[in-house]
Amino acid sequence: MACILCVASLFLSLTKFSIGQREVKIQEGPLYRAEGYPVSIRCTVSGHQGPSTQDFRWSIYLPSAPTKEVQIISTKDAGFSYAVYAQRVQSKEIYIERLQGDSVLLHISKLQMKDAGEYECHTPNTDGKYFGSYSAKTNLTVVPDTLSATMPSQTLSKKEGEPLELTCETTKATVQHTHLSLTWYLMQEGGGSQATEIVSLSKDFVLTPGSSYADRFVAGDVRLDKLGATSFRLSVGKLQPSDQGQVFCEATEWIQDPDETWTLITRKQTDQTALRIQPAARDFTVSITASSSPDEGKPLELVCLAVGRDGNPQLQGVWFLNGKEIAQTDAGGVLDLKRDYRDRASQGQLQVSKLSAQTFSLKIFSVGPEDVGTYSCEVAEVARTQMGSWQVLQRKQSPGYRVQLREPAARSVTVSAEQRTVWEGETLTLLCKAAGDVSALSVSWWLTPQDQSTPVFVAGMGQDGTVQLGVSSPGPAHRGNRRLEKVDWATFRLEIASAMVTDSGTYECRVSERLQNQAKGLQSTQKISVTVKSLKSSLRVNLMSRQPQVMLAHTFHLSCVVRANYSDLKLPFSVTWQFQPAGSGAFHRLIRIAHNGTVEWGDVLSQIHRKTKVSQSFFRSQLQIYDAAMEETGVYRCTVEVYDRDSICTSGPARVSATSNLLMITVTFPESKLSVNSSSQVQELSISSSTQIECAILSRSAGNLPLSIIWYFSSVSANASYLKILEMDQSSVVKYGDEFQTPRSKQKFYSEKVSQDLFLLNILSVEDSDQGHYHCAVEEWLLSTNDTWQKLERKTSGLTELKLRPTGSQVHVSKVNWTGNATEYGEAGFSCSLDGSGSTASLYSVTWYRGRGTATATAAAVANATATITAPAGSQMLVHLQYDGLLQYGREGSRRLQHCYRSSPTDFVLKLHRVEMEDAGIYWCRVTEWQQHGHPGKWINQASGESQRMVLRVLRSEPTVSSLICSSGPLLHFLIVCPFVMLLLLATSFLCLYRKARKLSQLSLSAKKEKALWVGMRKTSLQKEAGEESGHY
């Protein structure tokens, strides 16, 4: 039993292991990063099922709300971010980098203080069930950027070899434990934005020199010392020219994360110090010496020596001949020869080398006339910069050394030519003859081209008869055209078959002989100038035609005339005729007559070879095209290629080519005489009848060219367009238009040719829908030789209007005379009746009119688009009651007409409400009968009739007070305005009286007060007098 339990436990463990448990891991915190700098947080998921690429969601819990989730960014949902982070996510300041399907990095490019908090990485469940962890958290603390690096901005001028000391001050106030690293850089002038590292102190306090300063650091010439806690000093014992540039230091602050990795959190650079270094003086002198006397044919070695410079200077030398640079050797021994001397060095004729650090050599193995002149050398001291290039410190020039050959007495030589001026492609023959006694001679021919100053070896023959051709000849094919032969012991002939323009120049024949008992032989030279004229320089091609405008089906001629000054050479040539169709931008080949007689046709005009004749004579080609077609309108030109005389046998390429001027050929139609009857007519028919419409041709072009007849129709409805009924083309094939393709339309309309000048359109069983305008279009066609039709002219006939004649019986309207009176503002009524009950298959419409002195007649549309109701001249349509009960009013009808109705199928009533004086006049009605015809049924106007005129008189009503007032505008205005004016005057009067009464009241009160005072005084006086009197008694 225990064994079974163990097995079960093991099975469950394996099952759990195979299924796996999801686990999300995030970079361990807390993490400390500085404000303004980036941060990257890693998150991975393992043990998951589902797709290999998992989605990640990042959120933050801020210290101010530690339980509130703020969504930042997601790999799945673009709208996951909260508004506070959405803008930074959209601007890519915050983004997710996927390392693998199950691993990502959250990047924040520029941290803000508000970014501090607890970050959560969450992975949505893709497993069959929830098992494991789906999120992980870490803390991020954003600390202020307190790092600073300072160094005064200054410009220092130093001499080479002097010491240099620069100090960089750094401070930081980060609360957490951090390390500093510091690096000194040099930014050289012209080095772009790339700085060179001098020396650095790592965060682990390890000194490391830059690659360019490793040797000097090991030697102790470059040092980095830490002075106290914040100062770092760069010391250079002996400055070198390569140290010139901008010097600065960079401080970097590092912090160790919980996973024990060091991460950069801040970095600062100081201002730059401009360092100018004056190279030390290194004076030396340069001299030039020769190893032997400069005899012709002998070797010559020139040595350039720099003297007076101690140490191991880096020197480069430059050789000059007559002030022109010929060779240069740099400090590393790399040789650079100019083009003329590069060829001689490759042939082993000279050698330039650097014998030692201060010695340069120029060796010429066989001195010739071209080596005569003044030689000098220039030595420059250089130093390699940090970028690897050479910097020149100083230059010194040697005195000139004159090289002049001592020529031995030589025999005379004469050079002649059969023709000193030949055409390109002709044979150039030169003879070189030496005078004197018979001797074994060798000869070499040299050519100095017209645009060069250095001779080029053409051919040579040794004393044993061995011929050597120049290696500088332009290609093996051209070398085969050169031949050098010996006519006799003293005469040598150079023959250049099929000469080229590049063969022009000055030819020099050098005759050499070896003297007995002498190491060097004698050489005699002579020159001759030869010109090879270009064939293209005088080649002219003209294209001419007497008929730039050609009538259709006529013949035109083109002549390609070649003009050249070498026509007597009778060189073979080919002619290519080209054609650019009208409206095209490219030329196409019509025909090419090769110089060997081969004819090649183009494919632009398929029938051109059937009607073209080409004749060619010496320097002239003629093209004759019969039966011109319209597609042959365009621009023509011819191209001429001139070949060598023997090119037929050798199949060589053309020497030159030239293209003629452009010539426009226009193929025009012959003048057409087509004329068609353009008069218009009207046909009035009964419904279901048949008719014919004529298309008469008055005149035609000569030859009775084929015609095509096209019939068109336009209905009477507004804005109706013309529709094609049928077309009988120039081959008498009839085609119906798109709207007339039905079998019924093809039976109803058909064309008939009565004669050469008369065509008919037959219309059977005319219906209401057939009403409208008909005309024909006549096209005259011309058949070209390539079996294509060309339209010559198109004419259009006049219009034929087709109307339906009313077919019903006459409508009899009651003719009873009626004269009536109506009171103004009262009502009036009119009646209109038919005599009889009318047809049961008919419906009736009525139109009411009123006669008026000079009123303009108006028209109103009725039942359908093909019928109109027109008011008689001098009358006005008031209202129209259609057969289907719809009402249409005239211009004034809708203003007062209130009621128009049908009292019975054949009785009609018109009532006027609130009659006015201007309504007096003559009234009458017109009744129209309508019947339904065809399938589907359409209502057709059958007949109409008018009633007797009815006279209406309008009597004025007796005036009342209110009517008088309302009828008089001034009185009405007076009655409205006058009360307001009276009220205003009354109010003004009351106000004045009130103010006056108040003033009088005040005056009265004052008078009373004065009177009372006077009365009191009077009483006192009287009492006093009475007392006195009583005293007397």
Swiss-Prot record:
Residues in compartment: Extracellular: 21-970
Membrane-topology annotation of the record: Single-pass type I membrane protein
Effect of R620H: In strain: NOD/MrkTac
GO terms classed as biological process: positive regulation of myeloid leukocyte differentiation
Post-translational modification: N-glycosylated.
Outcome of substituting D451N: In strain: NOD/MrkTac
Motif window: EWI motif: 253-255
Signal peptide residue numbers: 1-20
One GO CC annotation: membrane
Keywords, sorted A to Z: Disulfide bond, Glycoprotein, Immunoglobulin domain, Membrane, Repeat, Signal, Transmembrane, Transmembrane helix
Source superkingdom: Eukaryota
Pfam families for the chain: ig, V-set
Disulfide bridge partners, by residue number: C43-C121, C168-C249, C304-C377, C432-C509, C560-C638, C695-C776, C832-C925
Transmembrane segments: 971-991
Effect caused by changing V392I: In strain: NOD/MrkTac
Ig-like C2-type domain ranges (all copies): 22-141, 144-266, 279-388, 408-529, 539-657, 670-797, 806-941
Subcellular location: Membrane
Topological region Cytoplasmic: 992-1033
Principal location: membrane
Result after altering I648M: In strain: NOD/MrkTac
Glycosylation sites: N139, N677
Cited function: Plays a role as inhibitor of T-cells proliferation induced by CD3. Inhibits expression of IL2RA on activated T-cells and secretion of IL2. Inhibits tyrosine kinases that are required for IL2 production and cellular proliferation. Inhibits phospholipase C-gamma-1/PLCG1 phosphorylation and subsequent CD3-induced changes in intracellular free calcium. Prevents nuclear translocation of nuclear factor of activated T-cell to the nucleus. Plays a role in the inhibition of T-cell proliferation via IL10 secretion by cutaneous dendritic cells.
Protein name: Immunoglobulin superfamily member 2
Organism: Mus musculus (Mouse)
